[in-house]
C-alpha cells in the first residue's frame, strides 16, 4: 500500500499540462503512421521478393502479378521487427521529451500492428496473414496457439508500457497513489491513444474502401490495459528538479510531413522496387 503523503499545495496543482497531453496525442498519431507504413513496406518488400510486382499506395499495397500468398505475412513480420528495433533505440535517450515520447508510441503501435493479426488469426479468413497462413497447410488447431501468442504479446506490450508512461511524470506526487497513476496514464496514454489515430486520418485519405480509416479508432484500445496496469505499478521513481513537460511542435511537424509525403508521393502508387525512369504507376 502506498504511504507517501501528498501535500495540499501539490494536490491542487494541475496534474498534467494540456499542452503535453496534446503533444502525446500527436506523438501517438505519428506512431500510427509509422507503424502502418512499415506494415505496408513489409508487404511490398515480401511481394517483390515473391515476384508479385507490388505497388505501394498511401493506404494499401496492391499486387499486379500472381504468386504465393506467403508474401502477405510480410506486413506483420516487418511490424514486429521494427518494433524490436525501435525498442532497442528507446533507452538510448535519457531525456523525457517529445522525441522520446514519439519513439515510445512508435514502439507500441508497431508491436500492436504486428501482434493483432496473430491474435485474430482464427477469426478471420480474408486478412493478409490468414491468407498467408492457409498456404502453409499446417494441422488444424495450430492457429489457436499462434492466436494465444499474439494475445499474450498484445497484453505484454500494454502492461509493460505503464511504467514507461509513468516515467514522464514531472514529480513523484503525481504518481504516488493508485488513483494518481491511473489519472496520469489516462491523460498521457489513454486519451492520446484514442485521439492520436484520429489525427492520423488525413494521411490515409481517401480511403478508397480499404477499411483502414474506419479501423483507426481501435488502434489505441490497448491503452485501457495500460491504465489498469498503472494502478499497481509502484517502481517508477521521478528525480528531483524534473522539468514539467508541455507543448512541443515536433510531433505535429512530423505528422504534417507524413501527410504531405503520403498525399503527393505514395498516393500516386510507388512501384516496388522503384524505377528511376518511371517510379510511379501513373508514369508508366
What is the predicted function of each stretch?
Residues 96-284:
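N-terminal low-structure segments adjacent to metalloprotease catalytic domains
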Residues 1-18:
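Short, Lys/Arg-rich, polar N-terminal cytosolic tail immediately upstream
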Residues 72-87, 150-157:
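Hydrophobic alpha-helical transmembrane segments
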Residues 78-80, 86-104:
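Hydrophobic/aromatic-rich structural module bridging two neighboring secondary-structure elements via a short loop
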Residues 43, 47, 82, 116-120:
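Alpha-helical transmembrane segments and their lipid-water interface positions
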Residues 24-35, 191-194, 254-255:
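Alpha-helical transmembrane segments
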Residues 16, 21-26:
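An N-terminal structural lobe/cap that precedes and organizes the functional/catalytic core
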Residues 27-79:
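Small-residue-rich helix-interface/hinge motifs
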Amino acid at each position: 500500500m502506498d504511504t507517501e503523503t501528498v501535500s495540499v499545495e501539490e494536490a491542487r496543482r494541475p496534474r498534467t499540462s494540456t499542452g503535453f497531453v496534446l503533444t502525446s496525442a500527436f506523438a501517438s498519431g505519428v506512431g500510427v503512421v509509422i507503424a502502418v507504413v512499415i506494415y505496408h513496406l513489409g508487404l511490398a518488400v515480401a511481394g517483390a521478393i515473391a515476384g508479385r510486382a507490388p505497388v505501394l499506395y498511401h493506404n494499401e499495397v496492391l499486387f499486379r502479378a500472381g504468386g504465393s500468398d506467403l508474401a502477405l505475412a510480410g506486413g506483420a513480420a516487418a511490424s514486429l521487427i521494427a518494433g524490436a528495433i525501435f525498442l532497442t533505440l528507446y533507452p538510448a535517450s535519457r531525456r523525457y521529451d517529445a522525441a522520446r515520447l514519439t519513439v515510445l508510441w512508435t514502439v507500441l503501435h508497431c508491436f500492436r500492428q504486428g501482434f493483432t493479426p496473430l491474435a485474430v488469426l482464427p477469426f478471420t479468413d480474408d486478412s493478409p496473414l490468414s491468407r498467408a497462413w492457409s498456404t502453409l497447410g499446417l494441422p488444424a488447431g495450430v492457429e489457436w496457439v499462434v492466436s494465444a501468442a499474439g494475445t499474450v504479446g498484445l497484453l505484454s506490450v500494454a502492461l509493460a508500457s505503464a511504467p514507461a508512461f509513468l516515467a514522464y511524470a514531472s514529480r513523484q506526487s503525481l504518481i504516488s497513489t493508485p488513483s494518481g497513476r491511473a489519472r496520469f496514464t489516462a491523460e498521457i496514454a489513454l486519451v492520446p491513444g484514442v485521439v492520436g489515430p484520429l489525427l492520423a486520418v488525413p494521411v490515409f485519405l481517401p480511403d478508397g474502401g480499404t477499411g483502414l480509416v474506419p479501423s483507426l479508432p481501435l488502434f489505441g484500445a490497448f491503452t485501457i490495459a495500460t491504465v489498469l496496469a498503472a494502478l499497481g505499478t509502484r517502481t517508477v521513481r521521478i528525480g528531483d528538479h524534473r522539468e514539467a513537460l508541455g507543448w512541443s511542435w515536433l510531433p505535429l511537424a512530423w505528422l504534417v510531413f507524413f501527410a504531405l509525403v503520403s498525399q503527393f508521393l505514395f498516393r500516386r502508387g510507388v512501384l516496388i522496387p522503384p524505377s528511376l525512369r518511371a517510379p510511379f504507376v501513373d508514369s508508366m
